[in-house]
Structures are given as structure tokens and as C-alpha cells.
């Protein structure tokens, strides 16, 4: 056990990099998990996205189903969609419930659709009183939102996450864990925490006789080997789950104009039968 032994830890860090790989794998899974909660209001673990436990059914984060919104028109229809109006409508609806939206989080490719919309270009051009060709950027749109009565203080935040996940067949793929068509409305960017507890092996004397162990953040790492024939294993595990601290203050909009599916019950959490 190298807990509290800086010299032993340094030796392990120098000799082996396996612990970095397994640690990053756990952190990557939690990034995937958090992005799913923020963009879908829940998650599903199945054989196509997880090599361990499966839920098969959607597990919500507790966000009220009333907070699930749908754009009036698919944002990809640049001549008829009005993303700025969709954003304003959601901010106003949240305000009526006592929620002050400050951030609208979306993927970069979704913002690319927003800035090409005819209605958006005309609104921004009229606001700055510019007749010639206008270059729409995140900075310009954020300045526009800040100047409007209903969206004062609202800022668009762009994300482009990328993580590697493993399925039940142990095939690894790189994915963007943020649901492509969805955007998230938040009061605070720090909208959740990772709740975690101890792992039984952490305090097992017998376990530590057979393995070198290290606790990094909430991730428990262990390394052990056999001599004949020589084999070595490194494992990282966490007894943890990400949670949205105030799901009532989070809103998610589908910008493809499609209704939420019946199975996406964001209000139903793992405490209700999963």
C-alpha cells in the first residue's frame, strides 16, 4: 500500500503507467455520464455503451418532465427556424417558475445551425443597425442576448467533449457524449457533484497484502501480479455517481423539433425502482 508513502508512489509512477490509463478510463466514463445528464436529463447503460452493469431503461436525474422543451422548428431549417426565439421562450418559462437562466449550453455544431438561421441574422442585423454583410459569432449573439430584456444576463456556452467508451464486447469507440440536438439551460455551470463512498477493498488488510493500492480523488486503483507464468493487472474502480444538485432549475430543449420519447422520463431517478 503506497497511501501516504510518497517514495513508493514515485517509484510506481516511474515504473508503471497502467494506473494512469485505468484512472483516466474511470474519469472518462464519468465525463460521459455527466454530459448525458446535462444533455438528456438521464442515461441508459446497455451492452452497446457499457461493458459492465446495464440498466436497459432510462434513469432520470430528477428534472421535472415539464422542463423538457422542444424547438418550434428544427434548427437545421435555416429559412424558418428561430433559435433565438426558442431560447427566449424557455428563459421566460423558467423565469415564471422562479428560475433565472444564465447559461445555454450546446454543442458547437448546434451553434453552427443557430447562427445560419435567417431569423437570427435579421434580428442581430437590426439590433446593430447594419445593412452590409454580417458575420455572426458567439460573441455577437451573446452581446445581443445581453441587450434584450428577457434574456439579459444569458450567455451561450459551447462544448465539444470527446471520450472513449467500451461496450460489452470490449470494443472501444470515441464518442461525443453530449446529445447532438439538445441544449441545456442552467442557473449555474457548476450544476452538480459526484457523490461517492468507500470501496470495501480500501480498508481490507488482506487485499493490501496482495496488491499495491492508491486512492486518487474518488478512484481506487490497485495493481497485483502472478509469477508463474508472470501476469500483471491494474484496476481502477469507483463507488460513485454524478448528480444534478437542483434538477428543478435545469431545462433541456430538443432543437430538432422532435418530441421527447415516452421512455425518456427525466423525473424518474434510480431511487424509484432501478
Give the role of each language-model region.
Residues 1-62, 86, 92-110, 230-238:
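Long, contiguous amphipathic alpha-helices that act as assembly "spine/axial" helices in icosahedral shell
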Residues 1-6, 47, 67, 143, ...:
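Proteins with a high burden of low-complexity, intrinsically disordered sequence enriched in S/T/G/P/A and R
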Residues 46, 56, 64-66, 196, ...:
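Intrinsically disordered, low-complexity, compositionally biased regions/tails
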Residues 121-274:
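Sequence/fold signature of self-assembling virion shell proteins
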Amino acid at each position: 500500500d503506497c497511501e501516504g508513502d510518497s517514495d513508493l508512489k514515485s517509484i510506481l509512477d516511474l515504473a508503471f503507467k497502467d494506473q494512469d490509463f485505468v484512472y483516466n478510463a474511470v474519469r472518462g466514463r464519468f465525463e460521459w455520464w455527466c454530459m448525458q445528464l446535462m444533455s438528456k436529463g438521464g442515461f441508459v447503460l446497455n451492452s452497446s455503451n457499457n461493458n459492465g452493469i446495464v440498466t436497459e431503461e432510462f434513469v432520470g436525474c430528477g428534472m421535472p418532465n415539464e422542463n423538457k422543451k422542444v424547438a418550434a422548428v428544427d434548427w437545421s431549417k435555416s429559412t424558418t427556424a428561430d433559435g433565438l426565439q426558442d431560447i427566449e421562450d424557455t428563459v421566460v418559462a423558467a423565469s415564471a417558475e422562479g428560475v433565472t437562466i444564465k447559461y445555454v449550453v450546446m454543442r458547437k455544431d448546434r451553434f453552427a445551425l443557430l447562427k445560419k438561421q435567417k431569423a437570427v441574422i435579421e434580428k442581430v442585423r437590426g439590433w446593430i443597425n447594419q445593412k452590409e454583410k454580417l458575420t455572426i459569432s458567439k460573441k455577437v449573439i451573446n452581446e445581443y442576448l445581453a441587450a434584450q430584456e428577457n434574456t439579459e444576463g444569458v450567455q451561450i456556452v459551447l462544448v465539444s467533449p470527446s471520450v472513449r467508451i467500451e461496450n460489452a464486447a470490449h470494443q472501444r469507440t470515441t464518442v461525443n457524449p453530449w446529445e447532438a440536438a439538445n441544449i441545456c439551460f442552467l442557473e449555474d455551470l457548476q450544476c452538480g457533484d459526484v457523490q461517492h463512498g468507500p470501496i470495501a477493498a480500501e480498508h481490507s488488510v488482506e487485499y493490501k497484502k496482495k496488491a499495491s493500492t492508491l486512492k486518487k480523488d474518488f478512484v481506487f486503483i490497485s495493481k497485483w501480479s502472478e509469477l508463474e507464468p508472470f501476469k500483471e493487472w491494474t484496476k481502477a474502480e469507483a463507488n460513485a455517481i454524478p448528480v444534478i444538485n437542483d434538477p428543478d432549475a435545469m431545462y433541456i430543449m430538443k432543437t430538432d423539433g422532435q418530441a421527447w420519447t415516452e421512455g425518456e422520463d427525466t423525473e424518474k431517478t434510480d431511487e424509484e425502482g432501478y
